[in-house]
Amino acid sequence: MRRSRVLGAIAGALTLLTFSLEASAQGSADSDASWRRGTARRESDQTWAFELRFGPYRPNVDDEFEGGAAPYREVFGDSKRVFFGMELDWQALRIPWVGTFGPGVGWSYTSMSSKAKLSGTNVDSAEETSLWLMPMYAAGVLRVDVLPRELSIPLVPYGKLGLGYGLWKASNELGASEQGGVTGKGHSYGLHAAVGLALQLDFLDAAATQQLDNSVGINHAYGYLEWMWSDLGGFGGGQMKIGTSTWVTGLAFEI
């Protein structure tokens, strides 16, 4: 009988210890979950993406001429000019396990100037001639942000496809240039496409990222590198070819 009472006491103690350990583990898990909820990133609604864009630009003006003629190169040379621009995208649709898709519009500007050539020669004249270009586009934009959202890999590949439209004007010191009664200004349109890779910068300072979201609503910031192709020539309709193929870099912000 005494032995039975001892065994019963030991069994009761073991049962109580088991319940205590389970309660302690559950409390620790709840505490850990609460801590994680308290420190997790809280993001505001994300609807827009805005890009600042920079890169080299050399229009394909000479591509429309045959027989080796290259009027653009003869006046402005082979060097590329720098363009700057902006893009605004509406992230209208979120595709699960892929990213965002929606329409975007972009605008950019570049200009070049040089001494005009004396007629029929390669000799510079005293007259300055210049050309400015204003390419624009509307495109569908797909940003594949599943890597940073689900796997904590801060890389976002993306693609763009749409239509481009550009204004241009050639002028000299007297105003808009004119030849054969045709004023040196006009417009061109065509296809626009781009692919790129963006690096999400949140990992550099998570606290600053949260503060930026809280204060002005910027969810994420990116640096990016993009290859852009713009065929602005009227689909072969005789417009001046002011498009180009070039790389683009800059900063992007999701808002």
PLM regions: where:
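Short glycine/proline- and aromatic-enriched beta-strand/turn motifs that initiate or cap beta-hairpins
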Residues: A25-L93, G233-K241, A252-E254
